[in-house]
Design a protein with these regions (language model features):
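Short, structured coil segments at secondary-structure junctions
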Residues: 65, 82-84, 135, 185-186, ...
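Active-site beta-alpha connecting loops in nucleotide-dependent enzymes
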Residues: 49-52, 56-59, 311-313, 322, ...
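ATP-dependent carboxylate/acyl-activation modules
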Residues: 116, 122, 312-317, 438-442
Length: 446
């Protein structure tokens, strides 16, 4: 937003400009909702939360050198009286003002916007899109967790002038949330990576989950493109005839032909592509096909080496000093991603045992027991030892036929692993965030 002056920022947000910045001051560099991260030149947006009213910190942000603040009228007087030369903008609802500002900046950028959602795989697809597109276009992708009604507008506002493609991850916790994110971002391409049993506790059925994800398709303009998994029955009621659709996966417009080591062969609407990748997991090949389809939708022909940079908690492999390989996939879990993680464990070379440390999968509703038993059965033939963490994960022992240990929490699991792991072992750690299995990885790496 550096090219915008304070008057334009206020007008775009639908806010009142109560105090201007220093004469000749350009627009803000970034927007932030945490005053501690609102540095000099940034716009601090004071949001009212369940426990904290961010507007109370507006004066401190100005004193610290913020370009300006956007607050409720109740905090405007204190902000105007604060030291510093920053702008003060007031709006009845700073959050909706943030949304309006983001949409205005998105339109001014002129970038192609790709929205990515899915029950699993949206983060890796977003990252793969960045790797696919960056050699051909100036591409910006969502930062970690900038995928909510707060994170998406902040990510849009962080995109600098000259951005050609903006790839936005879109998360949801219930119906209506993807529709909101799409209204803010106005995507040119909407990608649904997968549909699966996630947030069942809130939505109740797979059909309801598909409907919530398909809000992205419903929001697309007629000139936009939907990128969808081929043959996904749950999405059939939500297909549109007035929007171009590209499918990926078996029998899709973009499909895998073969993988030989790091070389992947893809058929993209009859065109043969050969890419070099740094992964061999089946679920990542699926995500790669989604990324390739989205790239083709905006006229980019993927080529060369596509390198996925894995983040901690998202399948990152590390060799521990004791000679144990850790697969850190502790960020989150659902039945689809749990199977994918076990597949990754299966293809990881091991001189010793393959150990699966699996925690509760939360928010699965009344069918939680069944889903956990299915994971226990799936682990047969993959894991030599299964360590279940938490009361729900205990159900995995019912169907797992190998050696099994049940522990109550992450700390106990970490202590157990410290005793039993041997050089050459491979250990997978995965569970829902609420179980806190990140602690296990931290202990193993210490």
């Amino acid at each position: 937003m550096r090219a915008w002056d304070a008057q334009r920022v206020a007008a775009a947000a639908g806010a009142s400009l109560l105090r201007g910045p220093a004469a000749g001051e350009r627009g803000p560099v970034y927007a932030a909702v945490d005053s501690r991260s609102a540095g000099p030149g940034d716009l601090f947006v004071g949001l009212r939360g369940d426990r904290v009213d961010g507007g109370r910190f507006a004066a401190a942000a100005l004193t610290a050198g913020a370009w300006g603040v956007l607050v409720e009228p109740a905090h405007a007087s204190a902000a105007v009286a604060a030291t510093g030369a920053g702008a003060v903008l007031a709006a009845d609802n700073p959050l909706t003002a943030l949304w309006r500002l983001a949409t205005a900046w998105r339109r001014d950028l002129g970038a192609t916007v790709i929205g990515v959602t899915g029950s699993t795989g949206k983060t890796s697809t977003k990252d793969l899109l960045g790797a696919v597109l960056s050699p051909a276009r100036r591409t910006v992708t969502s930062r970690a967790n900038f995928n909510t009604e707060i994170g998406v507008p902040l990510q849009i506002l962080a995109a600098p002038q000259g951005t050609e493609v903006l790839v936005l991850e879109m998360a949801m916790r219930g119906a209506g949330q993807i529709a909101l994110l799409a209204r803010i971002a106005e995507p040119d391409v909407g990608v649904i990576v997968s549909i699966g049993p996630v947030h069942l506790e809130q939505l109740g059925s797979l059909e309801a989950i598909a409907s919530a994800k398909a809000e992205l398709v419903a929001a697309l303009a007629p000139s936009a493109t939907a990128v969808l998994p081929a043959g996904e029955r749950l999405l059939e009621p939500h297909l549109r005839t007035d929007v171009k659709t590209l499918t990926f996966g078996p029998d899709g417009d973009v499909r895998l032909v073969a993988q030989h080591g790091e070389s992947v062969e893809i058929d993209a609407q009859g065109e043969h592509l050969t890419l070099t990748v740094n992964f061999d997991e089946a679920h990542l090949r699926h995500d790669l096909l989604a990324a390739v389809a989205a790239a083709i939708a905006i006229g980019v022909r993927p080529a060369g080496k596509i390198e996925l940079v894995r983040a901690p908690g998202r399948g990152l492999r590390r060799l521990l000093p004791r000679g144990v390989t850790l697969i850190d996939d502790a960020y989150n879990a659902n039945p689809m991603s749990m199977r994918a993680a076990l597949d990754a464990l299966a293809v990881t070379p091991a001189q010793g045992r393959r150990v699966a440390v699996l925690g509760d999968m939360l928010e699965l509703g009344p069918e939680a027991g069944r889903y956990h038993r299915e994971i226990g059965a799936y682990a047969n033939g993959i894991a030599d030892l299964l360590v279940s963490v938490g009361p729900l994960a205990a159900a995995m022992a019912v169907t797992f036929r190998g050696e099994h240990q049940l522990v109550a929490d992450a700390a106990t699991a970490a202590a157990l692993l410290d005793e039993i792991l041997s050089p050459g072992d491979v250990v997978l750690v995965k569970g829902s965030n609420g179980v806190g299995l990140k602690l296990i990885c931290e202990k193993l790496l210490a």
